[in-house]
Amino acid sequence: MTTVFALALNLAILLTAASAVADERRIANCLACHGEEGQSQTPDVPSLGAQPTQYTLIQLFMFRERLRVATPMNEETKGLSDDDLQNISTAISKLPPPGPPPEAGDPQRLAHGRALAEQNHCNVCHRSDFAGQENVPRLTHQREDYLLKTLGEYKTGARHGYDATMAEVLQPIDENDLGILAYFLARAR
């Protein structure tokens, strides 16, 4: 009986170690595109650092099930189990948040962007510091180009959220103001 227990314990330890190595490889694959420590340096590719676990899990699930289509992400998530998605999401949430761009930014554009964020109640779902929560993404210090692309996709309906909220909120905002909002969120302090 002791031998069987010892074998079972050793097998469990080996499987746990193998799973941890597999998770590390998957995270390394993520960071190859999304940047070291989850801070993207690649145009139109989002930074992942400190994204809420639940938000990331939902996005990975949507990529895996092709409910959200982006070929590289659909390929990376194909065949991953729910546990794999959970482990990746948890690891991503523990990465440091992305830092702001090196330049402080134009005070007038930042003030206009802050006013737009307040006027459109971005702080209600994304929190007052725009760090996101639960199934709502972190926006603070996200890549400006990615923010602009994504805001435009929500506005036109090319990208769907969990409901129509984002499309409704963004509908009255013109293209120039979308750019200013993205500028502000990338630099919000």
For the regions a protein language model found, what residue spans apply to each?
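Inter-heme linker and motif-flanking segments adjacent to c-type heme-binding CXXCH motifs
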Residues: 39-40, 69, 94-108, 129-137, ...
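N-terminal secretory signal peptides that target proteins for export/translocation
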Residues: 1-3
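Protein kinase-like catalytic domain
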Residues: 34, 64, 126, 155, ...
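Gly/Gly-Pro-rich "capping" loops immediately C-terminal to redox-active cysteine motifs
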Residues: 38-68, 74-80, 114, 118, ...
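Sequence/structural segment immediately N-terminal to covalent heme-attachment motifs in c-type
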Residues: 20-39, 100-101, 105-128, 143
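C-terminal capping alpha-helices of c-type cytochrome domains
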Residues: 78-100, 145, 171-189
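Bacterial N-terminal signal peptides
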Residues: 6-16
